[in-house]
Structures are given as C-alpha cells and as structure tokens.
C-alpha cells in the first residue's frame, strides 16, 4: 500500500509562485512549453524542481536552492504574496485522484513558515491515506477495507515551522515522498559532464549532469547498450561508451567511428562536443529508472545539431508509455514534430505569467495544412486558449 506503483501526474497549480499569480499546468504523455523569453517557462519548471527536492534535501534547502523564500514570492504592484503549490496525480488502478499541497507564509526577519500542508492518497487496493498540517499540529490517517481507520496527531512546535511534515506524516508522507521523487528535471551543463566527476550516490540524477558518470555506471549492461544505441541515432558513429576511472575520479570514454572507414577512435568526455554530452545526459536521465514518472527537460535543442533534433524528439516520445515528458523549447523544428495538443503556451501579461493550451483558431489553419506550428512560433502567433 505504501509503494505507489505506476503514477500518472495530472497537473500542478501555482499560486503566487515566482512570476505566476494563479495558473494551472495540465500534464499529458508529452507536453512542450513554448513562449517568449521571460514569459515564465523556467519558473514553472522551478516549481516542479522545488517539489522534487523536498523529500531529497528537505524543505529549507530546497527553498534555499531557489534563492530563498523571498525570491519565490510573486509580487503584484510591488507587494509580495505568499506562494502555494498543489500537485495532482493518480495511482494506476485507483478510482480517485490524489494530491499534495503546500502553502508558505512570511514571518519577521525574512524567514518563512509552513502555513498549510496536506496530502490525500488513494491506492489501487482500495486503501487511502492522508494528512493535514496546520499552524500548530499535524493530523494523519490511514484506512483500508480490511482494517479499521487509524488516526494520528501531534504538535508541530516552533522548531518545525519551516519544515515539511512529510517525514512525520506516516503512510501518506512516505507515499507522497516517493511520488515527488519521480519528478526529474534535466538542465544539463556540458562543462559539468566533461569535467572529472566525484563518485556519487546513484539514487538522484543531478539536473546539471554532474553525476552522470556514476548514474551510467550503475546501469546494467543492457541499459548501457540501449543508451549507446540511442545516442548513435543522434550522433553518427558512436560505437561504445564506458566509464573510465582516473585516480579517484570518474569520466566517460566514447568510442566513435568515422565515415571514411578508419578504425574507431576513443575520446574522453572533455573531448566530445557539448551537443553530444547534452544528448547523452538526457538519455541517461530518461532511462535511469523504469518506474513511471515525469521527466522535465529545459531547451533540449541547445547545442544539438538541427538534423538530430527530430531524432531526439522521436526517442523521447517513444518512452512516453512509461515516462511522462515535459520540455521547454524555442525550437520551431521541435514544435513541428509534435501534435498540436502537446503544446502549452506560456505568456506574460499584466504582471503575471500564464499558461494554456493552444487556441482553437490557431489549430484550424495548421490542421488545414495552411501553416505549420513552427511557422506560427517564429511569427509569435501561437495564441493561447483564454477562458
């Protein structure tokens, strides 16, 4: 009952979070956030990353890694507002939606407190669990058709004011923590991949790729070969990829054949192109865990050859039966490779970011073959569906 099994993420609601005043981002198998620079795409990703890091690093560090509490607050006419997030998901086999919500408030001295925190989990076997955290106490429960409902309560105290209640929320907290850890963000820094890396924990893929060698080394032979074959579809000539140990550090060794028939040559990571290292890291993140989850990739087109973009998108879409995928992009070529229903428009208006699906009047000329989504993107004519 505690293990969630397959999970499908449905939506995330953002209230007074960074540039978002009030918005809901709905997920599907594959979605792409498109919009101008500074429209709010990265801020939506920041919300997902914050939730992902709560069970891994704790709420205080997760907030600190975003620049601190004050940086998270949306400002309307100069006045800061307190942020809140709500993630809705569904466990396969359950007949009801589950959720986790978190609301933060300011206190003197630039600090924060958890105003409200709650979760509801509905399991495939008919069981359910949940918790509610207020200013002074946490109340949790668990019930199942085969046993009586059990309830637990305890006080939070001032020492827990800035902490998440998930570790203390028993069954619901354990399940929600496992669900949040299935959110994975990828923002690869090729320089981090190229440099010699410290051996590290293989449980968490660092979004910048700084521990990708350790993650790749933890794969079994079949998965390593799968990564190699998929990278070869993007970067012609890749024959093999291995982890090399140099003293107490790790790096990657690529073997690549040339088109002139000469013997394949070996290259260390620092000798490979940024595009190759980015594509490799994205594939490792994609295949690191066969459990269902949501993989978020910021601007996958950066440093990747134009001709390889469609191949990368095809590889990503081929995994959506197992893993939901969200990307942010400015690439018209990527947009042209996606169904219209996969696109989400992000725009900034009247002091706040917004997100919505494509407007129907935008879809009609595309469906009639008069224009492509990529051409509309280039001309800033991907209009959102405004309620």
Which residues are covered by each model-predicted region?
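Conserved ABC ATPase signature
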Residues: 232, 236-287, 294-310, 366
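Conserved catalytic network of the ASCE P-loop NTPase/AAA+ motor domain
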Residues: 77-80, 93-94, 286-289, 317-321, ...
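Phosphate-binding glycine-rich loops of NTP-binding sites
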Residues: 29-68, 279-280, 331
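C-terminal lobe/lid and adjacent interdomain/linker elements of RecA-like ASCE P-loop ATPase modules
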Residues: 1-4, 310-387
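N-terminal pre-Walker A segment at the start of P-loop NTPase domains
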Residues: 1-21
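Conserved P-loop NTP-binding catalytic core
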Residues: 46-112
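Phosphate-binding P-loop
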Residues: 6, 22-28, 287-290
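Electropositive, glycine-dotted interaction segments
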Residues: 94-229, 233, 239-242
């Amino acid at each position: 009952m505690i293990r969630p099994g397959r999970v499908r993420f449905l939506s995330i609601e953002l209230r007074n979070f960074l540039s978002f005043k009030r918005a809901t981002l709905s997920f599907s198998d594959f979605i792409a956030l498109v919009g101008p620079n500074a429209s709010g795409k990265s801020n939506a990703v920041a919300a997902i990353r914050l939730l992902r890091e709560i069970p891994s690093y704790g709420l205080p560090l997760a907030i600190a890694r975003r620049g601190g509490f004050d940086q998270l607050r949306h400002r309307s006419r100069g006045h800061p507002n307190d942020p809140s997030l709500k993630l809705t998901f569904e466990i396969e086999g359950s007949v009801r939606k589950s959720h986790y919500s978190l609301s933060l408030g300011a206190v003197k001295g630039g600090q924060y407190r958890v105003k409200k925190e709650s979760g509801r989990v509905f399991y495939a076997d008919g069981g359910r669990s949940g918790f509610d955290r207020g200013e002074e106490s946490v109340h949790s429960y668990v019930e199942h058709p085969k046993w009586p409902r059990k309830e637990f309560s305890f006080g939070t105290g001032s020492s827990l004011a800035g902490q998440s209640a998930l570790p203390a929320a028993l069954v619901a907290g354990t399940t929600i923590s496992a669900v949040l850890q299935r959110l994975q963000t990828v923002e690869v820094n090729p320089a981090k991949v190229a440099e010699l890396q410290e051996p590290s924990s293989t449980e968490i893929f660092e979004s910048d790729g700084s521990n990708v060698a350790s993650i790749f080394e933890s794969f079994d032979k079949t998965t390593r070969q799968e990564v190699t074959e998929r990278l070869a579809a993007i970067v012609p000539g890749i024959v093999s990829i291995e982890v090399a140990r140099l003293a107490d550090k790790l790096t990657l060794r690529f073997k690549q054949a040339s088109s002139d028939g000469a013997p394949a040559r070996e290259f260390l990571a620092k000798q490979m192109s940024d595009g190759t290292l980015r594509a490799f890291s994205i594939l490792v993140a994609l295949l690191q865990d066969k459990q269902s989850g949501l993989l978020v990739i910021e601007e996958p087109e950066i440093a990747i050859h134009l001709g390889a973009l469609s191949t990368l998108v095809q590889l990503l879409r081929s995994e959506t039966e197992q893993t939901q995928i969200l990307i942010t992009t400015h690439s018209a070529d990527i947009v042209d490779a996606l169904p219209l229903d996969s696109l989400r428009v992000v725009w900034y208006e009247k002091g706040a970011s917004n997100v919505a699906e494509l407007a129907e009047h935008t879809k009609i000329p595309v469906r009639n073959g008069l224009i492509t989504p990529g051409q509309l993107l280039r001309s800033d004519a991907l209009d959102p569906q405004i309620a």
